[in-house]
Structure formats: C-alpha cells, structure tokens
C-alpha cells in the first residue's frame, strides 16, 4: 500500500502504546508497509521489538489504523509542518494614507506611488481625506479627490467601501484585486 496519510483533524493528541484501548487494530509497519489487522497486544509487542511506539493515526476508521513509528520524531515533524504553514500565511494589514482636499500634485503622486506599493504587497489601504476649518463647506473637493484616486488606481483594485463622511474626514477603503 505504500505511504499513508496521517490525519489529525479532530484529534489534537494521538493515542500511543497502552493508551490505545480497542482490541483489534489495522497496523502499518515502520517502513510504511501494510501489515494487516492484529490484536492490540500483538501490535504492541511488534512495536516494542523494533524499539518504537504504536501510534493511533486514524481513530475513526474501523478498525482504527495504527502505525509503528518513533512518536517523538512524529510530533516534531507535525510541529515543523504546522510552523511552515503558519509562516506561509500572510497577515493582511490595513495601511492608512491621509490626504487633504488641497493636497499638492507632488505630494499626491508620492502618496499614490506608496498606495500602489502597499496594494502590490497585498495590503488594504484606508484613504482619509481630512477637512479643516471652512473646507467642510467644500466637500465636493473631497469627492473629486476620491474619484481621482479611484481613476488613477485603475482596475487593479477593488473599492471595498465608497467614500463616506465620518466627522471631519472622508474615508474610503481599497483592496488589491485577487489575481486568478
């Protein structure tokens, strides 16, 4: 039968040796070869003869599947796989960029470049357009700024939330478009 898949989906702790309480188990040898259905005592004696542990790897099967292996090494490999999987997942951050309705062209271009970089890295960007003093009476300038940002970013972004007014600032959220 060759290699077997070891699943520990619902069972955090694998039972080993004398913790296994079922009378008959399906045994896989230390070399990965299927040995067959044996009594628990026979399987334990076989594991002890090889100086290894009998580990229950599929308790929900009928009869449960056990493998003769080094339990310490097995746990170490499991931990290593879990750490690798954890490393590969990227936490999405929310970056925030602040604009004003009268943001100068040079500053606008720099912020736009930074925004594109954040989006390429897979982060979401929260855009704040702050109004000061009498600028509140010219909210259309903020809407124009938001529309310009949306136009300049093009099709490589998803607008998660349209520009909305929160107190004295207009807030908009953009995220990178998923590449398929």
Curated annotation (Swiss-Prot):
Cellular component, GO, one term: cytosol
Subunit structure: Monomer.
Protein name: Translation initiation factor IF-3
InterPro entries in the record: T_IF-3_C_sf, T_IF-3_N_sf, Translation_initiation_fac3_CS, Translation_initiation_fac_3, Translation_initiation_fac_3_C, Translation_initiation_fac_3_N
Function statement: IF-3 binds to the 30S ribosomal subunit and shifts the equilibrium between 70S ribosomes and their 50S and 30S subunits in favor of the free subunits, thus enhancing the availability of 30S subunits on which protein synthesis initiation begins.
Keywords (A to Z) from UniProt: Cytoplasm, Initiation factor, Protein biosynthesis
SUPFAM superfamilies: Translation initiation factor IF3, C-terminal domain, Translation initiation factor IF3, N-terminal domain
Domain of life: Bacteria
Stated family: Belongs to the IF-3 family.
Annotated GO MF terms: ribosome binding; translation initiation factor activity
Biological source species: Xylella fastidiosa (strain Temecula1 / ATCC 700964)
Localization terms from the record: Cytoplasm
UniProt record, GO biological process: ribosome disassembly
One Pfam family from the record: IF3_C
